Amino acid sequence: MSLDFNEMQERQKALQARYAGWWEPIDPEHGKNKILWMLAELGEAIQIVKRKPVSELMQEGSVRSDFIEEMADVLMYFNDVMLCYDIKPEEFAAVYRAKHGRNMTRWKKPGE
């Protein structure tokens, strides 16, 4: 089952509502903090990649599960950042697709 940005953002809104008053709010003033938390979670994923053999990342088990969980944390904060700055999934998708299109022709491979 796939997961899209609309669902992720709805889940983040529900999480924020559950902890309202305890967690910092989702607004532009706190966007910077969400980016920093996202980077901290990415750092945790990086530590797993640095310290564990790639074979353990590629096979079912606790290392792979822990790595995927850290990546999920990164995406949770990524969606918080999008919510802080009122970036809609459709807006992000359009920019992503445009950037991908530019990157597909940005560099020439040898012989092209």
Regions found by a protein language model. Name each.
Residues M1-E112:
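Flexible "arm" and connector segments at domain edges
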